[in-house]
Amino acid sequence: MNRQINNYPSKRKVQQLLKSKRSSGILLHITSLPGPYGIGEIGKEAKLFIDNLADMGQQYWQILPTNNPETCNSPYDTNSAFAQNPFLISLDGLIKDRLLIKEDLDPIPNFKTKIIDYKKLKDWKSSILSKAATNFLNKEENLLLDKYNNFCSQNDFWLNNYALFMVIKEMQNNRKWS
């Protein structure tokens, strides 16, 4: 092994790595977290998972890409390098931010716990996220509006084109075109 290291261009970095404190972590995609809404979300379950990792002495949580998946629902098959998966948005977080009320979620479908039923999830959660977006835009006193406007201005290099693409895609019934 030393002979291999001596011939390696970044020999010093490799030697430092071999002497460094070992660390460990877990690979788990956010969608695999437990939760009542059919898919793992970036919310309280994610925070609890991080706390549990720390309690177990784990230093890293590796996740798969969180971009918006294309038709096969794979995190590696995305339609944007920048847009995130809207189904990872925490519904409880939207309730906390007063963009939804608990009753907006009713009726919550009976989701399977071992596999994600993407059709059922998308049909249900899309309408709820649309309601949250409408509530956000119609709110008289909106404390999140500055953050939203800042996000839009910082991401204008891709956001408008992506929004246009998604509208056209929806108008085409999500068919692929070239």
What name fits each language-model region?
Residues N2-V14, L18-S178:
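Acidic/aromatic-lined carbohydrate-recognition and catalytic surfaces
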